[in-house]
């Protein structure tokens, strides 16, 4: 993974998995299998690929990039092969990587999966770091990691790169990974619910009601929600 010089704020760690309907998994370092899983979900894509960032003002910047599931920011490869974090992430409207569109929202970067008129079904992939966990949480005592001093970065990309923090990993630290479906309506993201689907597909209310009677849908799981969305779109 392109992380030999990666210096990312708030990272690292892992162990035994518990999968829920929300596709959420909890882990604690240093279990090897969990560490491998952490590495596999740290970014949205398995590698850094050429992409384009579109700012709110329409400005476009190109680079070799990926989206971090921890800080929900665009990371890119600098001229020294360092992994850097885009400085003005709050000004990014969207990014295109491998032909896929990722919309920057208050929840993070959501990938557009399906479209139906002005409504899109999207997916958020999120890795959450659980610092200062209460005693007993995940079956472990409270443990944290210390942060070293800021490292300055002079790399320029999309109006500059952010200073990065380097973690001194000297203890275990729990994290969880999840995939969450969202509706994107005219640029605004909403959690997927029966009420939301009824609202944005008013002519399909009867179909939605019947579909939900015949199918036990968990609205926090991407796969069944995607099937429902496609069925509503095609009906």
Predicted segments with their positions:
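Generic detector of short, locally flexible boundary/turn motifs and exposed helical patches
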Residues: 26-32, 38-43, 88-89, 146-150, ...
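Aromatic-patch recognition
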Residues: 61-189
């Amino acid at each position: 993974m392109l992380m030999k010089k990666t210096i990312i704020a708030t990272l690292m760690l892992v162990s035994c998995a518990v999968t829920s309907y929300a596709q959420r998994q909890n882990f604690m370092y240093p279990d090897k299998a969990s560490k491998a899983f952490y590495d596999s979900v740290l970014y949205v894509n398995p590698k850094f690929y050429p992409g384009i960032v579109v700012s709110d003002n329409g400005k476009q910047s190109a680079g070799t990039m990926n989206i971090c599931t921890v800080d929900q920011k665009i990371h890119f490869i600098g001229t020294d092969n360092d992994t850097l974090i885009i400085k003005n992430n709050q000004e990014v409207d969207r990014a295109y990587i491998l032909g896929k569109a990722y919309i920057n929202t208050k929840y993070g970067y959501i990938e557009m999966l399906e479209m139906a008129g002005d409504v899109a079904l999207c997916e958020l992939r999120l890795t959450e770091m659980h610092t200062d966990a209460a005693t007993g949480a995940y079956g472990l005592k409270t443990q944290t990691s210390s942060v070293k001093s800021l490292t300055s970065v002079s790399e320029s990309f999309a109006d500059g790169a952010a200073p990065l923090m380097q973690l001194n990993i000297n203890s275990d630290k729990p994290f969880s990974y999840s995939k969450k479906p969202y509706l994107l309506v005219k640029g605004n993201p909403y959690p997927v619910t029966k009420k939301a689907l009824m609202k944005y597909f008013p002519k399909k209310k009867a179909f939605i009601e019947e579909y939900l009677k015949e199918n036990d849908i968990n609205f926090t799981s991407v796969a069944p929600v995607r099937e429902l969305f496609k069925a509503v779109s095609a009906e």
